[in-house]
Curated annotation (Swiss-Prot):
The gene is rpsJ. InterPro entries: Ribosomal_uS10, Ribosomal_uS10_dom, Ribosomal_uS10_dom_sf. The keyword Ribosomal protein applies. HAMAP family: Ribosomal_uS10 (MF_00508). This is Small ribosomal subunit protein uS10. One of its GO terms (cellular component) is ribosome. It comes from the Bacteria. The keyword Ribonucleoprotein applies. Involved in the binding of tRNA to the ribosomes. GO terms for molecular function: structural constituent of ribosome; tRNA binding. Keywords: Ribonucleoprotein, Ribosomal protein. GO terms for biological process: translation. Belongs to the universal ribosomal protein uS10 family.
Amino acid sequence: MKQDIYINIKAFDCSLLEECVRKFIDELKRSSAKLSGPIALPRKDSKFIVNRSPHVDKKSREQFEMRTSRRLIVLHDLTPTMMQMLTGLSFSAGVEVDLKVKEVKEVKV
């Protein structure tokens, strides 16, 4: 069975995200890995509305927005050296990296 790694990268700052993705792809190309991506996933927008004053004036409100940008990289044919390299990478604060390993069954026709 083959194993694929799905790498989800999330960040609030788009420039930080692109720098992290570039770093990932450069490291993976050095190890001659087969990969798909980076695939741009939809941006998540969260809006928060709060009252400006603590007691009165319900009409006076403030709006805040939080945007989360995401990218997906799929690594095919995982090797132990690739896994060590992936876990050894360090990224700047504000970037969240999730690794998921899935087994792919080969179908013979």
